[in-house]
Structure formats: structure tokens, C-alpha cells
């Protein structure tokens, strides 16, 4: 299964934001062990670095990003993806970019701590980490 992790799931894990961090960490482990194919949107990587550097320092943020780049594939953000996101009628441009970026790499699902932010979309399911773990049989 091809999964795109929302920025909030990764931040939950890296910043130990309870109660969401445990399920998110298990999803990331499932990707790392090959149980699922994992993707991060390119914008997620820069956001993760920025926010974790503010919280835990630049060196730690760089280590986190390096680790993520070893585990996950990166879904691109191009001009066409940004244009599609702008005309998507989504209430949040960040979520629209994640969705369109994931669509470009044929993801099956988005894993997010807040599934209500994403509108219903054809072909891509939206799941909380605990739900995707059940689907994966973890």
C-alpha cells in the first residue's frame, strides 16, 4: 500500500506529541520495514525542518530530516501540482498540495491526525494512523 504521511503525523512522532505519537511511530516503522511504501510531500520536509529546528535545535532537525529521507520517498511539488491545488476548492492550500502531490505518485491513502481537513477524493482514502495500522494488520 502506498501511503503519504501528512506533516502532522511526522511532527507528532518527532516532537513526541501525545496521544498521537505512538500510532504515528508504528506507521513509520511499517514503512521502514517495507510493510507499506511511504511518501512525504516535498513541502512536508521543509516544514518539518523548520518546526523541529525551532523546538529542538538545528542539528537535531537535520538528523530528523536525514532519517526521514532514508525511510520515505518524496512526492514532488511542481508548478502543475500547485496550480491543481489552487483550483481544487480545498479550504486549506497546504492539504490540497499534499493531496495533489500524492496523486502525482499514485498513493493509495493519506495518513493524517486530522482526517476532517481533507475533502472526499476519488481513489485516495484518508485515514488516521490507528486506522491504517488496522488495515495493514499491524
Where in the sequence are the language-model features?
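Short, well-structured alpha-helical segments
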Residues: 62-66, 82-83
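Ser/Thr-centric signal marking residues that sit
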Residues: 7, 44, 112
Amino acid at each position: 500500500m502506498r501511503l503519504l504521511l501528512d506533516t502532522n503525523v511526522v511532527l507528532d512522532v518527532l516532537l513526541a506529541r501525545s496521544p498521537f505519537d505512538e500510532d504515528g511511530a508504528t506507521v513509520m516503522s511499517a514503512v521502514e520495514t517495507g510493510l507499506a511504501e511511504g511518501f512525504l510531500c516535498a513541502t512536508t520536509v521543509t516544514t518539518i525542518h523548520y518546526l523541529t529546528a525551532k523546538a529542538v535545535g538545528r542539528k537535531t532537525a537535520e538528523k530528523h530530516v536525514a532519517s526521514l529521507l532514508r525511510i520515505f520517498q518524496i512526492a514532488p511539488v511542481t508548478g502543475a501540482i500547485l496550480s491543481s491545488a489552487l483550483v481544487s476548492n480545498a479550504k486549506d492550500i497546504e492539504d490540497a498540495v499534499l493531496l495533489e502531490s500524492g496523486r502525482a505518485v499514485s498513493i493509495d491513502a493519506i495518513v493524517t491526525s486530522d482526517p476532517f481537513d481533507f475533502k472526499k477524493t476519488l481513489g485516495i482514502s484518508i485515514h488516521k494512523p490507528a486506522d491504517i495500522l488496522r488495515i495493514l494488520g499491524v
